[in-house]
Protein backbone atom coordinates (compact mmCIF):
# COMPACT_ATOMS: atom_id res chain seq x y z
CA UNK A 1 0.00 0.00 0.00
CA UNK A 2 1.17 3.51 -0.80
CA UNK A 3 2.25 5.72 2.04
CA UNK A 4 0.09 8.78 2.59
CA UNK A 5 3.08 10.99 3.39
CA UNK A 6 4.75 12.31 0.21
CA UNK A 7 8.48 11.86 -0.39
CA UNK A 8 10.80 14.87 -0.34
CA UNK A 9 12.50 15.12 -3.76
CA UNK A 10 14.64 18.29 -3.66
CA UNK A 11 14.80 21.85 -2.34
CA UNK A 12 14.21 25.24 -3.95
CA UNK A 13 16.27 27.27 -1.52
CA UNK A 14 14.76 26.61 1.92
CA UNK A 15 11.52 25.23 0.43
CA UNK A 16 11.26 21.42 0.22
CA UNK A 17 9.63 20.07 -2.94
CA UNK A 18 7.73 16.84 -2.41
CA UNK A 19 6.77 14.06 -4.81
CA UNK A 20 3.16 15.30 -4.82
CA UNK A 21 4.25 18.63 -6.32
CA UNK A 22 6.54 16.99 -8.89
CA UNK A 23 3.81 14.54 -9.93
CA UNK A 24 1.36 17.43 -10.29
CA UNK A 25 3.84 19.30 -12.50
CA UNK A 26 4.25 16.19 -14.69
CA UNK A 27 0.48 15.84 -15.11
CA UNK A 28 0.17 19.55 -15.94
CA UNK A 29 2.83 19.25 -18.66
CA UNK A 30 1.18 16.13 -20.11
CA UNK A 31 -2.23 17.84 -20.06
CA UNK A 32 -0.94 20.96 -21.80
CA UNK A 33 0.81 18.84 -24.42
CA UNK A 34 -2.32 16.76 -24.97
CA UNK A 35 -4.58 19.81 -25.31
CA UNK A 36 -2.10 21.43 -27.72
CA UNK A 37 -2.02 18.32 -29.91
CA UNK A 38 -5.82 18.00 -29.80
CA UNK A 39 -6.46 21.61 -30.81
CA UNK A 40 -3.57 22.49 -33.13
CA UNK A 41 -5.57 21.57 -36.26
CA UNK A 42 -9.13 22.65 -35.53
CA UNK A 43 -11.69 22.02 -38.26
CA UNK A 44 -15.27 23.19 -38.83
CA UNK A 45 -16.41 19.56 -38.74
CA UNK A 46 -14.83 18.14 -35.55
CA UNK A 47 -13.09 14.78 -35.73
CA UNK A 48 -11.09 12.63 -33.36
CA UNK A 49 -9.80 14.38 -30.25
CA UNK A 50 -11.47 17.66 -31.21
CA UNK A 51 -14.85 15.90 -31.41
CA UNK A 52 -14.36 14.30 -27.98
CA UNK A 53 -13.30 17.63 -26.48
CA UNK A 54 -16.31 19.45 -27.92
CA UNK A 55 -18.70 16.76 -26.63
CA UNK A 56 -17.14 17.10 -23.20
CA UNK A 57 -17.54 20.89 -23.22
CA UNK A 58 -21.13 20.64 -24.47
CA UNK A 59 -21.97 18.28 -21.61
CA UNK A 60 -20.70 20.69 -18.97
CA UNK A 61 -22.27 23.66 -20.73
CA UNK A 62 -25.62 21.85 -20.57
CA UNK A 63 -25.05 21.05 -16.90
CA UNK A 64 -24.20 24.68 -16.10
CA UNK A 65 -27.24 25.92 -18.00
CA UNK A 66 -29.49 23.46 -16.18
CA UNK A 67 -28.26 24.39 -12.68
CA UNK A 68 -27.32 28.07 -13.03
CA UNK A 69 -29.16 29.22 -16.14
CA UNK A 70 -28.07 30.98 -19.32
CA UNK A 71 -25.27 32.89 -17.61
CA UNK A 72 -23.71 29.62 -16.49
CA UNK A 73 -21.64 29.59 -19.68
CA UNK A 74 -19.19 32.13 -18.24
CA UNK A 75 -18.13 29.57 -15.62
CA UNK A 76 -17.39 26.84 -18.18
CA UNK A 77 -13.59 27.43 -18.24
CA UNK A 78 -13.33 26.94 -14.46
CA UNK A 79 -15.65 23.94 -14.34
CA UNK A 80 -14.09 22.15 -17.32
CA UNK A 81 -10.55 22.80 -16.07
CA UNK A 82 -11.40 21.52 -12.59
CA UNK A 83 -12.86 18.28 -13.90
CA UNK A 84 -10.09 17.55 -16.41
CA UNK A 85 -7.31 18.39 -13.96
CA UNK A 86 -8.74 16.45 -11.00
CA UNK A 87 -9.60 13.46 -13.20
CA UNK A 88 -6.08 13.42 -14.66
CA UNK A 89 -4.56 13.54 -11.17
CA UNK A 90 -6.90 10.80 -9.95
CA UNK A 91 -5.92 8.50 -12.83
CA UNK A 92 -2.19 9.24 -12.73
CA UNK A 93 -1.62 5.87 -11.03
CA UNK A 94 -1.65 4.47 -14.60
CA UNK A 95 1.82 5.99 -14.95
CA UNK A 96 4.27 3.47 -13.44
CA UNK A 97 5.69 4.60 -10.10
CA UNK A 98 3.41 7.63 -9.78
CA UNK A 99 1.12 8.16 -6.82
CA UNK A 100 -2.00 10.28 -7.53
CA UNK A 101 -1.40 13.76 -6.06
CA UNK A 102 -5.06 13.84 -4.96
CA UNK A 103 -4.16 11.17 -2.40
CA UNK A 104 -2.24 13.90 -0.58
CA UNK A 105 -4.47 16.04 1.63
CA UNK A 106 -2.44 19.15 0.79
CA UNK A 107 -3.44 18.81 -2.89
CA UNK A 108 -7.15 18.37 -2.22
CA UNK A 109 -7.02 21.23 0.31
CA UNK A 110 -5.39 23.50 -2.28
CA UNK A 111 -8.13 22.65 -4.79
CA UNK A 112 -10.86 23.24 -2.23
CA UNK A 113 -9.51 26.55 -0.87
CA UNK A 114 -8.85 27.93 -4.36
CA UNK A 115 -12.31 26.90 -5.55
CA UNK A 116 -14.13 28.44 -2.58
CA UNK A 117 -12.15 31.70 -2.90
CA UNK A 118 -13.16 31.89 -6.57
CA UNK A 119 -16.78 31.22 -5.62
CA UNK A 120 -16.67 34.16 -3.18
CA UNK A 121 -15.19 36.38 -5.90
CA UNK A 122 -17.96 35.33 -8.30
CA UNK A 123 -20.50 36.09 -5.57
CA UNK A 124 -19.14 39.60 -5.00
CA UNK A 125 -19.02 40.31 -8.74
CA UNK A 126 -22.59 39.10 -9.18
CA UNK A 127 -24.24 40.58 -6.06
CA UNK A 128 -21.94 43.50 -5.28
CA UNK A 129 -20.28 43.83 -1.88
CA UNK A 130 -23.51 44.80 -0.10
CA UNK A 131 -25.49 42.04 -1.75
CA UNK A 132 -22.73 39.56 -0.94
CA UNK A 133 -22.83 40.47 2.76
CA UNK A 134 -26.64 40.53 2.73
CA UNK A 135 -26.57 37.01 1.31
CA UNK A 136 -25.31 35.71 4.66
CA UNK A 137 -28.37 37.12 6.43
CA UNK A 138 -30.76 35.03 4.31
CA UNK A 139 -33.32 33.65 4.84
CA UNK A 140 -33.31 35.20 8.34
CA UNK A 141 -30.82 37.58 10.05
CA UNK A 142 -30.25 35.29 13.03
CA UNK A 143 -28.80 32.68 10.65
CA UNK A 144 -25.81 34.93 9.83
CA UNK A 145 -23.32 33.04 12.08
CA UNK A 146 -24.43 29.67 10.72
CA UNK A 147 -24.16 30.86 7.11
CA UNK A 148 -20.63 32.16 7.71
CA UNK A 149 -19.60 28.90 9.39
CA UNK A 150 -21.12 26.93 6.50
CA UNK A 151 -19.01 28.90 4.02
CA UNK A 152 -15.85 28.36 6.07
CA UNK A 153 -16.51 24.63 6.35
CA UNK A 154 -16.98 24.13 2.60
CA UNK A 155 -13.24 23.88 1.74
CA UNK A 156 -12.72 21.43 4.61
CA UNK A 157 -15.62 19.30 3.40
CA UNK A 158 -14.49 19.40 -0.24
CA UNK A 159 -10.87 18.49 0.50
CA UNK A 160 -11.66 15.69 2.96
CA UNK A 161 -14.32 14.19 0.68
CA UNK A 162 -11.96 13.93 -2.29
CA UNK A 163 -8.98 12.75 -0.24
CA UNK A 164 -10.99 10.28 1.87
CA UNK A 165 -12.78 8.66 -1.04
CA UNK A 166 -9.59 8.17 -3.05
CA UNK A 167 -7.70 6.83 -0.05
CA UNK A 168 -10.62 4.49 0.70
CA UNK A 169 -10.57 3.30 -2.90
CA UNK A 170 -6.88 2.41 -2.61
CA UNK A 171 -7.57 0.50 0.61
CA UNK A 172 -10.36 -1.50 -1.06
CA UNK A 173 -8.22 -2.31 -4.10
CA UNK A 174 -5.30 -3.39 -1.90
CA UNK A 175 -7.53 -5.64 0.22
CA UNK A 176 -9.04 -7.21 -2.90
CA UNK A 177 -5.58 -8.04 -4.23
CA UNK A 178 -4.57 -9.54 -0.88
CA UNK A 179 -7.75 -11.61 -0.61
CA UNK A 180 -7.88 -12.68 -4.26
CA UNK A 181 -4.31 -12.55 -5.61
CA UNK A 182 -5.29 -14.31 -8.83
CA UNK A 183 -7.91 -11.67 -9.64
CA UNK A 184 -7.44 -10.22 -13.11
CA UNK A 185 -6.15 -6.64 -12.98
CA UNK A 186 -8.58 -5.34 -15.65
CA UNK A 187 -11.71 -5.22 -13.41
CA UNK A 188 -9.68 -3.50 -10.67
CA UNK A 189 -8.36 -0.95 -13.15
CA UNK A 190 -11.89 -0.27 -14.42
CA UNK A 191 -13.05 0.20 -10.83
CA UNK A 192 -10.25 2.72 -10.28
CA UNK A 193 -11.18 4.63 -13.44
CA UNK A 194 -14.85 4.68 -12.41
CA UNK A 195 -14.10 5.89 -8.88
CA UNK A 196 -11.64 8.53 -10.08
CA UNK A 197 -14.17 9.84 -12.60
CA UNK A 198 -16.99 9.92 -10.04
CA UNK A 199 -14.90 11.84 -7.49
CA UNK A 200 -13.80 14.40 -10.09
CA UNK A 201 -17.41 14.86 -11.18
CA UNK A 202 -18.72 15.20 -7.61
CA UNK A 203 -16.13 17.89 -6.82
CA UNK A 204 -17.04 19.75 -10.01
CA UNK A 205 -20.79 19.41 -9.42
CA UNK A 206 -20.47 20.77 -5.87
CA UNK A 207 -18.51 23.73 -7.25
CA UNK A 208 -21.34 24.45 -9.69
CA UNK A 209 -23.95 24.34 -6.91
CA UNK A 210 -21.87 26.70 -4.76
CA UNK A 211 -21.67 29.17 -7.65
CA UNK A 212 -25.40 28.80 -8.31
CA UNK A 213 -26.12 29.62 -4.67
CA UNK A 214 -24.58 33.09 -5.15
CA UNK A 215 -25.79 33.64 -8.71
CA UNK A 216 -29.40 32.98 -7.71
CA UNK A 217 -28.97 35.13 -4.61
CA UNK A 218 -30.27 32.65 -2.02
UniProtKB/Swiss-Prot annotation:
PROSITE patterns per record: ATPASE_A
Record key words, sorted: ATP synthesis, Cell membrane, CF(0), Hydrogen ion transport, Ion transport, Membrane, Transmembrane, Transmembrane helix, Transport
Any single Gene Ontology cellular-component annotation: plasma membrane
UniProt cross-references to Pfam families, sorted A to Z: ATP-synt_A
Transmembrane segment boundaries: 17-37, 75-95, 104-124, 162-184, 196-216
Entry function: Key component of the proton channel; it plays a direct role in the translocation of protons across the membrane.
Protein name (database record): ATP synthase subunit a
Species: Moorella thermoacetica (strain ATCC 39073 / JCM 9320)
Gene name tied to this protein: atpB
